[in-house]
Amino acid sequence: MTSLQRKGPQTRILSTGEEEKLKRDQALVSAFKQQKLEKEAQKNWDLFYKRNSTNFFKDRHWTTREFEELRSCREYEGQKLTLLEAGCGVGNCLFPLLEEDSNIFAYACDFSPRAVDYVKQHPLYNAERCKVFQCDLTRDDLLDHIPPESVDAVTLIFVLSAVHPEKMHLVLLNVYKVLKPGRSVLFRDYGLNDHAMLRFKAGSKLGENFYVRQDGTRSYFFTDEFLAKLFVDAGYEEVVNEYVFRETVNKKEGLCVPRVFLQSKFRKPPKDPAPTTDSASLLRKEF
């Protein structure tokens, strides 16, 4: 089994059969059930981690390869990096980073109290290098746990897709408060026309590009335009915003699974430098 990866500005083009499937599956889940799913979102994720423990997701050792910002503490000896992993799950991204770089200090939070407990039980967990807490990013103020404008990078990796589209902007506004000016949110999540989107059965659709799994957890599939507008409207500047295509090929079984992700960086604008004494006096003379 092999995996091939490439990047591009446009999402995957569907086959005729795939297009027909999406056209057939237009019926939406009832408003009553959608309200119930929103109300029980935390419970459903907690049950997910109860069923799967720490075994569902693989450790993500690719993040430093894809995001050079996570390597920025390697430029000189003693350099530190303060990270927020927003939506840390059970630590599949967090612990590879802490293990790889001793100069990283991480804040990490998750919607699920059970996931937070698993992080604290991990053999690599060290309270001196990591502060972990439960948080609903759409409602709970990160400033209760993190000083304002103190974080060098924020990771949002397969997190925002689990949030209702009408509440996604609240997550971005929340992390904006703790991110240093001139620093970036590092994003990767499901892209439009991903194989997982096409596997949903009829009766799973909640809205445009938004679906519910059998266990009650939800997933949104992003376009680059939707994501860019979401970030820019929250005050960020676009740095990179592109699709990542991965094909997992099993030649023995004749299978090819086309995955589509969106990988992006959005920067909090740097603060304008304070005017010097000379420039300030010139301004006074002008006016």
Curated annotation (Swiss-Prot):
The protein's role, per its UniProt record: S-adenosyl-L-methionine-dependent methyltransferase that mediates N(3)-methylcytidine modification of residue 32 of the tRNA anticodon loop of tRNA(Ser), including tRNA(Ser)(UGA) and tRNA(Ser)(GCU). Interaction with SARS1/SerRS is required for N(3)-methylcytidine methylation.
Example GO biological process: tRNA modification
Primary location class: cytoplasm
Keywords associated with the record: Cytoplasm, Methyltransferase, Nucleus, S-adenosyl-L-methionine, Transferase, tRNA processing
Name assigned to this protein: tRNA N(3)-cytidine methyltransferase METTL6
Residues in coiled coil: none
Gene transcribed to yield this protein: Mettl6
Quaternary organization: Monomer. Interacts with SARS1/SerRS; interaction is mediated via tRNA(Ser) and is required for N(3)-methylcytidine methylation.
GO cellular component: cytoplasm; nucleus
Subcellular location: Cytoplasm; Nucleus
GO molecular function: enzyme binding; tRNA (cytidine-3-)-methyltransferase activity
Organism: Rattus norvegicus (Rat)
Xref: PANTHER family: METHYLTRANSFERASE-RELATED, TRNA N(3)-METHYLCYTIDINE METHYLTRANSFERASE METTL6
Catalytic activity: cytidine(32) in tRNA(Ser) + S-adenosyl-L-methionine = N(3)-methylcytidine(32) in tRNA(Ser) + S-adenosyl-L-homocysteine + H(+)
Superkingdom in the source lineage: Eukaryota
E.C. number(s) listed in UniProt: 2.1.1.-
Family of this protein: Belongs to the methyltransferase superfamily. METL family.
Lineage: Eukaryota, Metazoa, Chordata, Craniata, Vertebrata
Residues reported in the UniProt entry to bind S-adenosyl-L-methionine: W45, Y49, G87, D110, D136, L137, I157
Region entry Disordered, spans: 267-287
Keyword Mitochondrion: no
